[in-house]
From Swiss-Prot:
Despite having helicase-like domains, this subunit does not have helicase activity. Its cofactor is Mg(2+). GO terms for molecular function: 5'-3' exonuclease activity; ATP binding; double-stranded DNA binding; helicase activity; hydrolase activity, acting on acid anhydrides. It comes from Streptococcus pyogenes serotype M1. Belongs to the helicase family. AddB/RexB type 2 subfamily. It holds the Pfam family PDDEXK_1. It comes from the Bacteria. InterPro entries: ADDB_N, DNA_helicase_suRexB, P-loop_NTPase, PDDEXK-like_dom_sf, PDDEXK_AddAB-type, Restrct_endonuc-II-like. This is ATP-dependent helicase/deoxyribonuclease subunit B. The heterodimer acts as both an ATP-dependent DNA helicase and an ATP-dependent, dual-direction single-stranded exonuclease. Recognizes the chi site generating a DNA molecule suitable for the initiation of homologous recombination. This subunit has 5' -> 3' nuclease activity but not helicase activity. Keywords: ATP-binding, DNA damage, DNA repair, DNA-binding, Exonuclease, Helicase, Hydrolase, Nuclease, Nucleotide-binding. Heterodimer of AddA and RexB. The gene is rexB.
Length: 1071
């Protein structure tokens, strides 16, 4: 064995490549070994350093791959054992054990996390060269007993199913020990680069290779200063020193110092020396030179999105200077936090990249389909799960519009559960759903699912066959092929499909002869799919590489950007969580030779120093270290390592927000520039100098010219929220000449509430989602129907009998039966409505001096100027003197307010009066009023009553009164009825003024509607808060930003309020 060390300013790879070339020139076969995470980059680097740029004598690979070169022909043809297969084996083993067999873990038998921990422990035992019987000295002896039962049973299953229990390295080591590879190894030289420690498995293999190979050469970075130190605790080279010292002591070799021809920039060397001096308690009498600062940059950004954008702009600048994407490396401090954002931003700047991390399959449509299938079976056909299956695009041949219509209907009819899905859809609504088509679609969905879900407990092989038959019926494979939109997606789908078929094969192999329920089968497949990962190799090598910063090696790329280096992630604190604690692992390690657990938490300090050292030397030309103060909406501090660099004299540059400028980095990429122009066009203008304004004026003029060629535009507006008028063609279609504009009191109220809301409801005809479950609209229909029946009953039956008959016959109507007898909740609503009817009905019995002459009266009121107002009057009453009035039933409290009416928000009563005036017989000229009747079950606070007497009854009937607007002429006739006339009496002239102003409101609204320009103007009564419908989800209206667009209501003081509003009405309606 030969041990080599060198300073960070030299290239260890070049030194080891020279050693490899010498061995190859002598006729030896050379294996150049790199860590798993670095083998791809190391292979490219080694080939670059070879003069011939390639050779068959030097193979750059990993330990695992190297073993296959020697054992591929002699290895037994057994089944491959991966993590998913292991999990299934442990699940089967736990199925065969009873809870009482496992005192410590009996309650966790079906816990997926526990099974994952078993898989991790089993893999650790293999890497550590340990068996489950070596787990002595645990905190609880029962833990070892349980683990022995579980793992031994799992290993028995592996033997029965012919799975290979040995790892590739174990098989390689066994072959070496048996002397099967002596001839080949005698002509082999092994060169090892990039390691600072070996696992127990690698350590044991290394000892065998050292005894049988021609030579083993290992290199590591250690400074000569550190190598000569006797005390190395806390030294930045502590990990490498321990690594070399352990090998030197074990193999009785003295490491040698070597140098390379290639010497990197002295700026990095000087920074490394300062970093070393800080941690080995020595001092230096010099500082970084001014020229050294050109190779380092420390950035601080406010948010991670801005941080990534700054990096993207800098990369574009490097390309402008002539560098390639492959010259750039981006390192992430927090892979999970940055992974989702860095892709879209790099795509915006058109930067091709390769993310050096396996992607989880959990977000793939196939996994979502399997998960929805499993949940549909487990939760008895829940609607959300069925719809998720359809939306995955993998179930059957349904268009998106068909799925949307199916979803809309199932939500309306509340279809959920197998019973409802299995029955034909018969319920319809005013929207007239295409039931024939929906039932055909229902059958195409239900029949294959029903055939699969009715499977009883049976052999696993039979379940897999039925599942495959189901997947064929729904054309899963064909739909999977149709998902891909690009070559990259094709490759991803192929990897996911291969993983899916492997999982099915493993399940068939392990559970083929075991009896299982379908739910267990689907749960196991779902778990395997969700935990699986896949990789896609980039189509070209000229890409920006992105990976975690702790996987970096020295001198990786000319330009390195390390971002997200906060205190929480740099350094990383690794804590193991599993079935064994670190203390238990340490006790086991004390008594084993060549066999030991890796305890990551025990090596945090020296590993972090080693990572920081590699990071500070990762670039050969320029290193950018960046930190964001906010990551995932959480504030974080600077890394202590970055604080050390600041003490060395490196300035911390606050990059700030990404304001637009005319630097090359801002305008050098068309796609990024366009996105920023759009962004700035949507926000308030920032302050600019005259030079900036001139520059952007010219740029915008040029950009608009280019956009016009592509029929695109950048809209400009004086307000944050604005709307466009409808085109003449649309106006002619929506409001054709010669055809009256149809309005109603409700439509007029919506218009004056918010014009844009009128546009949505009455021009676009957008409706809210319907539901078969009773809502306020259906409750109102029920109450109206009961009172309509009651008032039509002119028999001599007692009033209470009439009321009972009205309730009974209304409940028997098919529509109300369908609505109120569907479930217990609907039945409870019906009971409440019946109580309301019984509580409100007595008011009708008390008013014996009125006669109901009509109910549910449809009308059409001609307002002139091609305006037709339509509606339904709930009830028309006639007093004893022949005067007429209208009653409008309300399920909530309402009363006429002249100010609300003036502002157009309460035109209903006056509209009904105008209609009644038009349809009333010619011999009846007098109207006594228009009123609301609140249908309610009055609630009284008994604490306010001193005793139970007539005052209690009076309070109940006081709540049951007619409230509205009444004629002063009819005051005497109204005084004997349940009419609340206080502050509600108007003279005939005043009533005429109200009617004329009501007509004016309609004419004014119609004129504006026919122009086709609808404003976003919800009303405000005080100028501080907005009471109108803001429609935030559609308009993005924000009261604090858009108060200027709200319509301010006219409000007057309570004193003389009536007279003042009447005066305003006369002026505006030209009276």
């Amino acid at each position: 064995m030969k041990l080599i060390y060198t300073e960070m300013s030299y290239s260890m790879t070049e030194i080891l490549v020279n050693e490899a070339r010498k061995a190859a020139d002598q006729g030896y076969r050379v294996f150049y070994i790199a860590p798993n995470s670095l083998s791809f980059e190391k292979e490219r680097e080694v080939l670059t350093l070879l003069p011939e740029r390639g050779t068959f004598s030097i193979i750059v690979t990993r330990f695992v791959q190297m073993s296959r070169y020697f054992t591929v022909e002699s290895s037994p043809s057994k089944q491959h054992l991966d993590d998913t297969t292991l999990a299934m084996i442990f699940y089967r083993a736990l199925m065969q054990l009873k809870p009482e067999d496992l005192p410590s873990y009996g309650r966790l038998q079906n816990n997926s996390v526990f099974i994952e921990q078993l898989v991790e422990l089993y893999k650790e035992l293999k890497n550590a060269q340990l068996s489950v019987h070596d787990l002595t000295g645990l905190d609880h002896p029962q833990k070892q007993e349980d683990l022995i039962k579980i793992i031994e049973l799992a290993e028995t299953i592996m033997i029965q199913q012919d799975y290979n229990q040995d790892s590739p390295l174990q098989s390689f080591a066994r072959a070496i020990k048996l002397g099967l590879l002596n001839n080949q190894l005698s002509k082999t030289v092994v060169v090892i680069d990039g390691f600072s420690r070996f696992s127990a498995e690698e350590d044991y293999l290394l000892s065998l290779l050292n005894n049988n190979c021609q030579e083993v050469i290992i290199g590591s970075y250690v400074s000569q200063k550190a190598y000569q130190k006797s005390f190395i605790k806390g030294n930045i080279y502590e990990a490498s020193l321990h690594f070399l010292q352990d090998l030197a002591q074990k193999y009785h070799i003295k490491p040698v110092f070597a140098t390379s021809n290639q010497v990197f920039k002295p700026a990095f060397s000087r920074l490394t020396q300062l970093f070393e001096a800080t941690h080995d308690f020595s001092q230096v009498d010099w500082q970084l030179q001014k020229s050294d600062l050109d190779h380092f940059s420390l950035w601080q950004c406010h948010h991670q999105k801005e941080e990534i954008e700054h990096v993207a702009k800098s990369i574009r600048q490097k390309l402008y200077e002539g560098y390639r994407y492959k010259d750039i490396l981006v390192l992430l401090g927090d892979m999970d936090a940055y992974q989702l954002q860095i892709g879209p931003i790099f795509d915006k700047f058109e930067i091709p990249y390769y993310l050096g991390k396996a992607e989880p399959m959990a977000a793939h449509p196939l996994v979502q389909f399997i998960e929805s299938l499993e949940r549909s079976q487990r939760y008895n056909w829940r609607r959300e799960d069925i719809l998720n299956m359809l939306k995955s695009g993998l179930f059957g041949c349904f268009d998106d519009s068909d799925i949307d219509r199916f979803e809309e209907y199932t939500q309306f009819a509340d279809i959920k559960g197998f019973t409802k899905f299995s029955k034909p859809f018969t319920i319809n609504s005013s929207r007239q759903y295409p039931l024939d088509f929906l039932n055909e679609m229902r059958q195409d969905i239900v029949l294959p699912l029903q055939e699969l879900f009715k499977s009883q407990k049976q052999l696993g092989a039979s379940l897999v066959d039925k599942l495959i038959l189901f997947l064929k019926k729904i054309r899963l494979a064909e739909n999977m092929q149709g998902l891909a939109q690009s070559q990259l997606e094709v490759e991803k789908n192929e990897e996911v499909w291969k993983r899916f078929t492997d999982i099915l094969t493993s399940f068939h192999h392990i559970f083929g002869q075991e009896k299982l329920r379908l739910s267990d089968c689907l749960a196991l497949i779902k778990t395997g799919m969700k935990s699986a990962q896949y990789r896609v190799v980039p189509a070209t090598l000229d890409v920006v590489t992105i990976k975690s910063y702790d996987l970096v090696q020295p001198h990786s790329k000319p330009f390195v950007y390390a971002i997200g280096l906060t205190q929480s992630h740099f350094p990383k604190q690794i804590h193991h969580s599993g079935l064994l604690s670190d203390q238990e692992r340490a006790r086991i390690n004390e008594i084993r030779n060549y066999r030991h657990f890796d305890i990551a938490s025990a090596e945090n300090s020296k590993k972090n120093h080693q990572t920081a050292l590699s990071l500070f030397n990762a670039a050969t030309k320029e290193l950018v270290l960046s930190v964001s103060t906010v990551i995932n909406e959480t504030f974080d501090d600077l890394s202590p390592y970055l604080k050390e660099l600041i003490n060395f004299g490196l300035p911390l540059l606050d990059k700030g927000k990404n304001y637009l400028s005319y630097d090359n980095s801002d305008i050098g990429n068309y796609k990024a520039l366009l996105s920023q122009i759009i962004a700035i066009n949507r926000q308030d203008l920032i302050e600019m100098s005259d030079q900036d304004k001139m520059f952007w004026t010219v740029v915008l003029r040029y950009l608009r010219k280019q956009l016009r060629k592509q029929q695109l535009e950048l809209p400009t507006s004086d307000y944050r929220l604005s709307t466009k008028p409808l085109s003449k063609e649309v106006i002619e279609v929506c409001f054709p000449k010669g055809i009256p504009l149809k309005l109603s009191a409700t439509a007029l109220t919506v218009f004056y509430n918010n014009q844009y809301n009128y546009f949505l409801k009455y021009v676009l005809n957008l409706n809210k989602t319907e539901s078969i479950h009773p809502d306020s609209r259906i409750h109102g229909q029920y109450l109206h129907r009961v009172f309509e029946r009651l008032m039509k009953d002119h028999t001599q039956e007692p009033f209470d009998n009439k009321l009972k008959q009205a309730i009974y016959h209304t409940n028997q109507e098919s529509f109300f039966q369908q609505v109120y007898q569907d479930n217990a909740e609907a039945e409870y609503s019906l009971a409440i409505l019946e109580d309301i009817v019984r509580s409100t009905a007595p008011i009708l019995q008390l008013n014996q001096n009125i006669q109901v002459i009509d109910q549910e009266k449809n009308f059409q009121l001609d307002m002139g100027n091609e305006i037709l107002v339509h509606g339904i009057i709930d009830r028309i009453d006639q007093l004893s003197d022949g005067s007429l009035g209208i009653v409008d039933y309300k399920s909530s409290a309402n009363q006429f307010d002249i100010g609300t009416f003036y502002n157009g928000l309460s035109p209903q009563l006056m509209t009904y009066l105008a209609a009644l005036k038009q349809i009333a017989p010619h011999d009846i000229n007098q109207l006594f009023g228009a009123m609301y009747l609140h249908l309610q079950d009055p609630k009284l606070d008994l604490v306010t009553f001193k005793q139970i007497d007539n005052t209690l009854v009076e309070s109940i009937y006081k709540a049951l009164t007619y409230k509205g607007i009444f004629s002063e002429v009819e005051k005497e006739h109204l005084s004997t009825g349940a009419y609340q006339t206080k502050n509600a009496l108007y003279s005939n002239d005043e009533l005429e003024t109200l009617l004329n102003y009501n007509k004016y409101l309609y004419l004014k609204a119609a004129k504006h509607i026919k122009k086709g320009h609808f404003l976003i103007n919800p009303y405000t009564s005080d100028g501080k808060t907005v009471q109108g419908d803001q429609l935030k989800a559609i308009t993005r209206f924000e009261a604090d930003l858009d108060m200027g667009q709200a319509r301010r209501l006219v409000t007057l003081p309570a004193k003389e309020k009536k007279e003042c509003f009447l005066t305003l009405m006369r002026k505006e309606s030209h009276l």
